[in-house]
From Swiss-Prot:
Lineage summary: Bacteria, Bacillati, Bacillota, Bacilli, Lactobacillales
Recorded catalytic activity of this chain's protein: ATP + H2O + polyamine-[polyamine-binding protein]Side 1 = ADP + phosphate + polyamineSide 2 + [polyamine-binding protein]Side 1
Membrane topology: Peripheral membrane protein
Organism annotation: Lactobacillus gasseri (strain ATCC 33323 / DSM 20243 / BCRC 14619 / CIP 102991 / JCM 1131 / KCTC 3163 / NCIMB 11718 / NCTC 13722 / AM63)
Gene name of the record: potA
Start and end residues of each ABC transporter domain: 5-236
Domain of life: Bacteria
Purpose: Part of the ABC transporter complex PotABCD involved in spermidine/putrescine import. Responsible for energy coupling to the transport system.
SUPFAM superfamilies: MOP-like (SSF50331), P-loop containing nucleoside triphosphate hydrolases (SSF52540)
Protein name as it appears in the record: Spermidine/putrescine import ATP-binding protein PotA
Length: 363
């Protein structure tokens, strides 16, 4: 796939001295679903606004299909945005809202009618053309906003926290629908969110941001299974993170025990952090466990039990299990070498990728 959006060395500093973006470099390929994921103030919405043309970078360049659009007006970019509050016109009905952009462009009336009908069909709102905006649910208003954006046939669609106002059930439904719409249209979606589950569920690629920097980028599986640092490991899903020490390639020490692992390329004796995901830990009898822990609490969350336990060194453990246990009971915890992920302090994403490629190539 060809690159459609590229940001090179983009920095955004405001008049009060606050730096929202620090040397952002990212590439967006055509036809994929991307998420910009991070906490409040991480810079994700600032990136979206710079891509849309609503804000100019202090330095750096923005490219669209190889052309420098850094200083190009937002109206001249082949990019549309769906805002968090949908920005629908309450005095217009559904048809008029969706048709608005085409009418501004002075398109033929019959052409507008057909385009609006097709856009509403795409978002499953057939028969809603004459409805008033006030008569629609939050999910239906979301669909109207998307229809209004896609009717203009943009090359890129930007979505700014556009599911955050919906309830949990409707949000999950819309995640599926957005993904299906993107696949049908074949255009690039860039979705801004602070919700890890949304990003993991919908995206082909994720950019994880914090404090104005891209912490890690990659597929949802890669980012979840191979977090590059402590922030990513904690922000993307639940994690058990312990201090450790590398013994040698494929062997690490933590919790006063040595374990076989799947990591290499780290100096023997180097201090590291070790990540174990709660769902990768199995409760077993003490004899078959690699660790011995005491169960402190247990919550039933519908599809699993969330168990909190503590070992003899007072390390706290979070375990997700489909089977309950007893509070106060000593149990064994089992995990495979591949379940251990070792992180180096201060290792950049580029350094991490290089190390990973080196030892995977030796296997």
């Amino acid at each position: 796939m060809s690159d459609i959006i590229k940001l090179t060395h983009v920095r955004k500093e405001y008049d009060d001295g606050f730096v929202a973006l620090k040397d952002i470099n990212l590439t967006i390929e055509s036809g994929k679903f991307y998420s910009l994921l991070g906490p409040s103030g991480s810079g994700k919405t600032t990136i979206l606004r710079i891509i849309a043309g609503f804000s100019e970078p202090t330095s750096g360049q923005v490219f669209f299909a190889g052309k420098d659009i850094t200083n190009l007006d937002a109206a001249k970019r082949k990019i549309n945005t769906v805002f968090q509050n949908y920005a629908l016109f309450p005095h217009m009905n559904v048809f008029e809202n969706v048709a608005f952009g085409l009418q501004i462009k002075k398109k033929d009336k019959q052409e507008i009618k057909l385009a609006v009908k097709e856009a509403l069909h795409m978002v499953q709102l057939d028969g809603f053309a004459n409805r008033e905006i006030s008569e629609l649910s939050g999910g239906q208003q979301q669909r109207v906003a998307i229809a209004r954006a896609i009717v203009n046939q943009p090359k890129v669609l930007l979505l700014d926290e556009s599911l955050s106002a919906l309830d949990k059930r409707l949000r999950k439904d819309m995640q599926f629908e957005l993904r299906e719409i993107q696949k049908k249209l074949g255009i690039t979606f860039i979705f801004v969110t602070h919700d890890q589950e949304e990003a993991l569920a919908m995206s082909d690629e994720i950019f994880v941001l914090n404090e104005g920097k891209i912490q890690q980028s990659g597929s949802p599986v890669d980012i979840y299974d191979e977090p590059v640092n402590d922030f990513v490991a904690r922000f993307i899903g639940d994690s058990n993170i312990l201090s450790g020490r590398m013994i040698k390639d494929y062997e690490v020490e933590f919790g006063n025990h040595r374990f076989e692992c799947a990591d290499a390329g780290i100096k023997p004796g180097e201090k590291v952090e070790v990540v174990l995901r709660p769902e990768d830990l199995d409760i077993t009898d003490i004899e078959h466990g690699k660790l011995r822990v005491m169960v402190e609490s247990q919550l039933f969350l519908g599809d699993h039990f969330e168990i909190k336990a503590i070992d003899s060194d007072e390390n706290e453990w979070l375990i997700h299990s489909t089977n309950p246990t007893n509070i106060g009971k000593e149990v064994g915890v089992y995990f495979d070498p591949e379940d251990i992920h070792v992180m180096r302090f201060g290792e950049s994403e580029a350094e991490f990728d290089k190390r990973l490629e080196a030892y995977e190539g030796d296997e």
